[in-house]
A protein has these predicted regions:
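Bacterial N-terminal signal peptides that target proteins for export
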Residues: 2-16
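C-terminal motif of bacterial Sec signal peptides marking the signal peptidase cleavage site
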Residues: 24-27
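Acidic, serine/threonine-rich low-complexity disordered tracts
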Residues: 29-135, 201-308
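Extracytoplasmic beta-rich ectodomain segments of secreted or membrane-anchored proteins
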Residues: 117, 165-220
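Hydrophobic alpha-helical segments and helix pairs
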Residues: 130-173
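Hydrophobic alpha-helical segments, especially N-terminal targeting/anchoring helices
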Residues: 149, 192, 266-267
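Residue-level signal for well-ordered, solvent-exposed loop/turn and beta-edge residues enriched
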Residues: 154, 197, 270-272
Length: 308
């Protein structure tokens, strides 16, 4: 006879990787993935990823002089986006498992920004700390992506169209990196602001669990359209339950912390940050419905922008 506790342990052992992926929207391919299947070419097909709407609230307009910030984009822009994530988890007192993903560097060129709300992106030669992923990324050079943006800089949609020879692992890595960057971006208030202005950007992040994300932005400095903005991010789960994909069941969320900070240098005339880094991390604890087995996670992810 198998006890309820033994059944729970077996169930959680099988769901551990699923939970890691479900709760971390930045996951790409884990270090233990079978690259023989993950790197097979797949037919080109574009994917459009809707982005949850933002609510921006001005808390302090800052010092005079003040003026509005409007994202009126023109010309081309070339930047590098780097992302990385660290994920470890432990079931009860078993050995700690590592589901971290290697750092990915993605050169991006924004072009054809004549439309008021559309930004076209071209992917350059992407690289990874994992040589296997770097090899898989090589055929993805020239892939297309795009952003739909408001005049206050809020991103409302992300679309990705990989090149013909893009492999599955490369497609997933690019998609996750861009998605991660979208939810670490910042939009501007409608009202006039000056140095010292503080505003919040509220948005839901949909992964395995719906998270309410509040980004508090502080305008550290401003020189015309160039702004340096400090960010403080906090995520809280909307539910007390983590629903696992593919009807794999659910886990109770016993505790959940996810916070972060960073600084972005932006130009209102360009769609992507010029430079900066944002890191968000925290600890979570889940348990099976019987409460006899506990899954603990430690997660951290970083987005970094540089201009070559």
């Amino acid at each position: 006879v198998i006890s309820t506790s033994e059944t729970s342990v077996r169930r959680l052992r099988g769901l551990a990787a699923v939970a890691a992926i479900a709760t971390l929207m930045t996951a790409c391919t884990s270090s233990g993935e079978d690259m023989s299947s993950a790197t097979s070419p797949s037919p080109t097909s574009g994917v459009s990823l809707p982005v949850t709407p933002v609510t921006t609230t001005l808390l302090d307009p800052g010092a005079e002089p003040r003026s509005t910030v409007r994202s009126v984009r023109s010309g081309d822009q070339t930047v590098q986006l780097s992302t990385r994530s660290a994920v470890t988890q432990q079931i009860d007192d078993q050995a700690v498992q590592d589901f971290s993903t290697p750092e990915l560097t993605l050169p991006l060129t924004a072009t054809d920004m004549n439309s008021s709300d559309t930004v076209n992106l071209r992917v350059g030669t992407a690289t990874s700390a994992d040589q296997r992923l770097t090899d898989a990324l090589a055929p993805a050079e020239g892939s297309a992506a795009g952003l739909t943006m408001t005049d206050t800089g809020a991103i409302t949609a992300l679309r990705i169209t990989p090149s013909d020879e893009t492999q599955d692992s490369a497609r997933a890595a690019i998609e996750q990196a861009l998605n991660q960057a979208v939810y670490r971006s910042v939009s501007y208030p409608e009202a006039e602001i000056g140095v010292g202005a503080v505003w919040t950007v509220e948005q839901q992040v949909i992964s395995g669990v719906t998270l309410n994300q509040v980004t508090t932005a502080t305008l550290r400095s401003r020189d015309g359209d160039r702004l340096t903005i400090d960010l403080r991010i906090e995520q809280t789960p909307e539910s007390t339950t983590l629903e696992l994909p593919e009807d794999a069941g659910s886990l109770a969320i016993d505790s959940y912390t996810m916070t972060g900070t960073g600084t972005l240098e932006v130009d209102a005339g360009k769609p992507l940050p010029l430079s900066g880094e944002v890191t968000v991390g925290g600890k979570q604890q889940y348990s099976d419905p019987e409460g006899s087995t506990v899954l603990r996670q430690d997660i951290s992810d970083t987005v970094r922008w540089t201009t070559p």
